[in-house]
UniProtKB/Swiss-Prot annotation:
It comes from Phocaeicola vulgatus (strain ATCC 8482 / DSM 1447 / JCM 5826 / CCUG 4940 / NBRC 14291 / NCTC 11154) (Bacteroides vulgatus). Residues 61-81, 135-362 are annotated as: Disordered. Residues 511-518 are annotated as: G1. Residues 612-615 are annotated as: G4. Keywords: Cytoplasm, GTP-binding, Initiation factor, Nucleotide-binding, Protein biosynthesis. This is Translation initiation factor IF-2.
């Protein structure tokens, strides 16, 4: 036998989840649904565990039942008169349509009026039946009543109709009410006359008149053996009539009003006592609280005793009545009060029952009044407790203040932490990538934000303070520069106007790769620089000081045009005075050209356009000018403000005119500098030379750099031991706008850093150490540890790989450009991590790091030392050496693609038409088919297609030709073919044979 879970929870007084969890612990798994079923064995386990809960429920139900009975007894007293009014009102509405009065008289309830009319013939019929059942007169009388009720009241009387109409409402009582109210006076008279008739009833056969008289005594003895449903109606109406003599007299309106006023006075007095108690307790202390609470309890007890007494009086009065309705409710304690107790049973057949529920509901406010007094007392105590706390000693007050202070401190600390989480502590050395890591956003968003404010940046490009502030503010962060004290340590000297002297302009040549930037400089310098560059493309910033025929000097910076050298172009534009943008006349305005123009515009540098290669047959300078005009750059020839010159860098056509225009722009700028002060400027490039140590190419912006000066650049410092110009000739000093190569630094400063000449080496060392410390802190801040979210993302991808790379190069700019390009190759599936980058040859420490982190080493124009090469062979570390940046990027990209798992691609090999189907025993269906296209192989997979819909997909089970197994069948040949586990082949179906081919993934 199974039991529903809903019933089990109600029986055991526990929740469904509790039952399910307990059964799961015991090894039973059931659904957590009220309709789920459990076995007897599981039920026994539950009963054993939760028997205490079941007992508690039974006890609580008993307790609540007793309390309800008490509440009803109380309610019957206080609202009796109030309800009688409503009964009267309802009687008026229901008396007219009901024909219950004559029918009730026929039953024998009102025998005096209709004794001789209708009851006599009806009594005769059941008399014979009664004799068959019981010889006594008493049961016969009652059963006569039953027989009369069964045919007449159920069919004719409207009592069952009343039940249907008034069940939704709680008051279906008005039907019998008219009998109670209207026939009080005649019934009181009849009780006096009926006393002699009771004696006659014992001797004579039963009649309808004595039936009502004998009910007073007989009901208590016989009713337990009778059916409740049929006698309920009779008993209620009789009691209402017969109990009038013993029932307490109904109170008049004045008496009820007086009672209500007395109760109100009592409540007001109690409230006054409460208020007085509060005042006394405040004045006298805790001692009198207990006394007052005792008095309050006493007052409440008095009230309850008074109600109980009234209840007992009514019960006593009720016991004198021989109410037939005691049989209606054998289980109730107050059986002598039928109209009230019948209603407490929801399954009673009495139609009057609903009305008494209304009495209970009207009584509820009275009960709540008592509860509210308790609440008042409770609130009084709480109020006093709060008031008396203030009068305690100073120690308690001190402890409270201490607790509050601790809480305030904790709250302030939390607020500070929240604010700190939105404050970025950084130095001015921060790159775009590091800034993105600190803000925990993609680096593409940082670059996009910079582009929106007109600044072109790359991933590894260092940002200045102003840009960092703008970007951080865009994403809701505040910045705090921890390097402020270091910056203040270097004081800038103010130049006097009279000390300033004209200086040579610094001109940057920018443009797309292969558009002729270096060729132009070659012609100007009369030297072939390109021959020295690997692959014929510029990979370093070249800084050259050119002396013109008229004795004037121009410093040229040649920037790379390849897209990887974004940072170099940005640096070139940053330190320059004028920008020459070269565009090939036989090409278009390319992406790097646009980027170079944007860099120059962001730096606020005047632009001169040089349209190169005009000597070529397909050259079209006007097309270039048209494209520039579309970008809002109108040249002077077309009525704009930008100067342009058509040139041929190889032949030298127009180069002289171009230089004149550049010098004209320089004169308009009025460039001046003070040569008689300590030098400042920018680091253009830095590298590690095996014979000479760390070498830095600098461009002096102001002042004069001399041999022996103490130079501080970024985290590197040192004494200038030797100086060379761009032709590797030794010089003693370098003035403003002169490029110079110096030896003597203790490290390779980052390209783009500014340099200063410091008074003492000690001061330079201190500042450099502080900067190095800040840089290490910055590195720790930007280190992004592996989070659970990232682990989850990688697991979700399934095929995730990391490629760790160590980049070493000859100069800092190239290292930065290469690492930048490699990081850009990262995808969701393969992530490139540049774990270390540096300038100089590949050392043993690089190999050790690569072995520990499972990385490859990419050397750009550098070679490993002999010891590093041997160690790499032992450790199995892969060292790749490149001279052109294109090759490095392509090979790393190929390595990343090799790490990806190949994808499977379907390739259709043949289509076969089914001509005939054979059903062979122990084999199944075999299709006789013709190969329409392609060549079907035994190893292929197949799809069965019917009317263009795929019916089956699976493997080829057998492939035969003339009873011989074959490996393949070509086009226009017949064959027999069967598919594995396919028994639904029909004539006209198409079988499509295909094979799965592994395809290498691309990035």
């Amino acid at each position: 036998m199974t039991i529903r879970l809903n019933k089990v929870t109600r029986d055991l007084n526990v929740g469904i989840t509790t039952v399910v969890e307990f059964l799961q612990k015991k090894g039973y798994t059931i659904e957590a649904s009220p309709n789920a079923k459990i076995t007897e064995e599981q039920y026994a386990v539950l009963v054993k565990e939760f028997s205490t809960d079941k007992n508690l429920k039974i006890e609580s139900e008993k307790f609540s039942q007793e309390r309800q009975n008490k509440d009803r007894n109380k309610a019957s007293i206080s609202i009796e008169g109030f309800e009688s009014k409503k009964e009267k009102e309802e009687v008026v509405k229901t008396v007219i349509p009901e024909e219950a009065r004559p029918k009730l008289k026929q039953v024998g309830k009102i025998d005096l009026d209709n004794l001789n009319k209708k009851t006599a013939p009806k009594v005769v019929e059941p008399a014979a039946k009664v004799i068959e059942q019981t010889p006594k007169a008493e049961p016969v009388v009652e059963k006569v009543v039953e027989r009369k009720e069964t045919p007449q009241p159920e069919k004719e009387t409207p009592k069952p109709v009343v039940v249907e109409e008034k069940k939704p409402e709680p008051a279906p009582q008005p039907a019998p009410a008219p009998v109670l109210e209207e026939k009080k006076e005649p019934k009181i008279e009849k009780t006096e006359e009926k006393t002699p008739q009771v004696k006659e009833m014992e001797k004579e056969t039963p009649e309808a008149a004595p039936v009502q008289e004998k009910e007073e005594d007989d009901v208590f003895k016989i009713r337990p053996t009778e059916f409740k449903s049929k006698i309920n109606v009779v008993g209620q109406i009789d009691l209402a009539a017969l109990n009038q003599s013993t029932r307490p007299k109904k109170k008049s309106k004045e008496e009820k009003r007086k009672e209500r006023e007395e109760k109100d006075k009592q409540r007001q007095e109690q409230r006054k006592l409460m208020k007085d108690a509060i005042i006394k307790e405040i004045r006298k202390g805790d001692d009198k609280i207990s006394k007052n609470s005792v008095n309050d309890d006493a007052a409440k007890k008095k009230k309850r005793n008074r109600i109980n007494k009234e209840r007992v009086d009514i019960n006593a009065a009720g016991t004198t009545n021989a109410g037939g309705a005691s049989n209606n409710n054998q289980r109730n304690d107050n059986a002598n009060r039928p109209n009230r107790n019948n209603n407490s049973k929801p399954n009673g057949n009495n139609n009057q029952g609903g009305g008494k529920f209304n009495k209970d509901r009207f009584k509820k406010p009275v009960v709540k009044a008592e509860v509210s007094d308790e609440d008042v007392a409770k609130q009084v105590k709480e109020t006093l407790a709060r008031l008396t706390n203030k009068t305690k000693n100073k120690a308690a007050k001190y402890r409270k203040e201490k607790r509050e202070n601790v809480q305030n401190r904790l709250m302030e600390q939390e607020e500070m932490e929240q604010e700190d989480s939105k404050i970025l502590k950084l130095t001015e050395f921060v790159t775009a990538n590091e800034l993105a890591s600190m803000m925990d956003i993609p680096v593409t968003q940082v670059i996009a934000t910079c582009m929106s404010i007109g600044i072109m940046v790359s991933i590894n490009q260092r940002l200045d303070a102003e840009t960092i502030n703008l970007v951080a503010e865009e994403f809701g962060y505040k910045t705090e520069y921890v390097s402020a004290e270091v910056a203040q340590a270097i004081t800038e000297e103010e130049d006097n106007e009279e000390d300033l002297q004209p200086r040579a302009p610094i001109v940057t040549v920018m443009g797309h790769v292969d558009h002729g930037k270096t060729s132009l400089l070659d012609y100007i310098r009369k030297a072939n620089v390109i021959a020295g560059e690997a692959g014929g493309i510029t990979q370093h910033i070249g800084a050259y000081n050119v002396k013109l025929e008229d004795g004037r000097h121009i410093t040229f910076l040649d920037t790379p045009g390849h897209e990887a050298f974004t940072a170099m172009r940005a640096r070139g534009a940053k330190v320059t005075d004028i920008a020459i943008i070269i565009v090939a006349a036989d090409d278009n305005v390319m992406p790097q050209t646009k980027e170079a123009i944007n860099h120059a515009m962001a730096a606020g540098v005047p632009i001169v356009f040089a349209i190169n290669k005009v000597d070529k047959p397909h050259a079209n300078p006007d097309k270039i000018k048209e494209e520039l005009a579309a970008m809002n750059f109108l040249v002077e020839e077309w009525g704009g403000k930008y100067q342009s010159q058509d040139i041929s860098a190889k032949k030298g056509t127009g180069v002289h005119d171009l230089l004149e225009k550049v010098l004209l722009e320089a004169e308009m700028l009025d460039l001046k500098a003070n040569p008689d002060r300590k030098a400042t400027g920018s680091i253009i490039e830095s590298s590690l030379d095996k014979g000479r140590g760390y070498v830095a190419t600098m461009l002096v912006a102001n002042g004069t750099l001399k041999m022996g000066d103490i130079v501080l650049a970024g985290t590197s410092y040192g004494k200038v031991k030797a100086m060379f110009n761009e032709r590797n000739q030794r010089i003693k000093e370098a003035g403003p706008s002169e490029p110079v190569l110096i030896l003597g630094l203790n490290g390779a400063p980052a390209a783009g850093d500014t340099f200063h000449v410091i008074d003492t080496e000690q001061e330079a060392r201190d500042i450099a150490n502080k900067r190095e410390q800040l840089q290490r802190e910055q590195g720790l801040r930007t280190q992004k540890l592996l989070t659970l979210d990232e682990v989850g993302r990688r697991l979700a991808l399934g095929d995730f790989h990391e490629l760790n790379v160590i980049v070493k190069g000859d100069v800092d700019g190239s290292v930065e450009a290469l690492s930048d390009s490699l990081i850009k190759l990262s995808t969701e599936q393969v992530q490139v991590n540049v774990i270390h980058k540096g300038v100089g040859q590949i050392s043993e420490s690089d190999v050790t790091l690569a072995a520990a982190s499972d990385a490859i080493i990419v050397g750009f124009q550098v070679r490993p030392s002999s010891s590093a090469g041997k160690l790499a062979e032992q450790e199995g570390v892969d060292i790749r050496k490149y001279s052109v940046i294109y090759d490095a990027i392509e090979e790393v990209k190929a390595a990343m693609e090799g790490m990806l798992a190949p994808t499977l691609k379907e390739q259709i090999t043949a289509t076969i038409e089914v001509r005939e189907v054979f059903n062979i025993t122990k084999v199944g269906l075999v299709a006789g088919a013709m190969v329409k296209t392609g060549k079907v192989k035994r190893s292929d997979k197949a799809r069965l297609i019917r009317d263009g819909i795929v019916v089956f997909t699976g493997a080829i089970n057998a492939l035969k030709r003339f009873k011989d197994d074959v490996k393949e069948v070509g086009t226009n040949f017949e064959c027999g073919i069967s598919l594995t586990n396919c028994n639904d082949i029909k004539v006209g179906d198409i079988i499509e044979a295909y094979e799965e081919v592994e395809v290498k993934q691309t990035l």
